[in-house]
Amino acid sequence: MSNILQERLKNKKIGVLSGPSFAQEVIDYKPTAVVVAGELETIEKSTELFHTPEFRVYGSNDIIGTSVSGAMKNVIAIAAGIVYGLELGENARAAILTRGLAETAKLAKGLGGQTETVFGLAGAGDMALSSLSMTSRNFSWGFSLAKKQPFDDKLTEGLNSSKMAIKIAKKIKIEMPITELVSKADNKNFDLQTEVENMMKRPPKLEWF
């Protein structure tokens, strides 16, 4: 998205603000830390505008990694909701979160981003927040899918993000099994329990290869 804006606006002064920040808590002045990615001038201006004692702003030059992390946290939140809804246990939810970070890191690196960004506020921070709370729309949607319950909120960005991520993953030849599962989760004939079991039956491999 940031690349599209830069191209359309003919302006490199684009910033990406991301991080663990439920809107209501920001409104209520609860302590929050986020990251703004962009060129130095953009970081300095954004920090000047947004940084307060309650809202801490860190800087990053990694727009790609920050953007990918912000999109993928919604995908992994859906997966975490599915695991929670299927009552597969806390071990499974922790595994989904950790392997979700690995998938995000591979995607970010493949697109030219920095893997360390994925383990900062935009990635691990936001992913943890979104994957461990019913306040997260994406987590709640995944939970509702697993429970076969209706869910009216249409602001579940993770489904569309997962479909786009899989298209990119195929082009750059990386595996993203959790993301792929989420991308098919809206299929009425898709049995989530079976698909999670199949994912666990994949051949063993080294953690980071």
Residue ranges and their predicted role:
Residues M1-Y29, T47:
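Rossmann-like NAD(P)(H) cofactor-binding subdomain of soluble oxidoreductases
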Residues E41-T42, I64-A71, R93-I96, G100:
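Mid-domain beta-loop-alpha active-site segment that forms a flexible
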Residues K13-G15, R56, E175:
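Conserved beta-strand segments of alpha/beta enzyme cores
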Residues K73, A80-Y84, K109-F209:
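NAD(P)-dependent Rossmann-like dehydrogenase/reductase catalytic/cofactor-binding core
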Residues I27-E44, A80-E90, A94-A95:
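Short beta-strand and adjoining strand-loop segment in the mid-core
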Residues G15-S18, V35-A37, A79, A122:
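Short beta-strand segments
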Residues P20-V26, H51-A77, Y84-E87, Q114-A122:
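Conserved Rossmann-fold dehydrogenase catalytic segment
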Residues T98-L111:
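An active-site-proximal "capping" alpha-helix that borders the catalytic cofactor pocket
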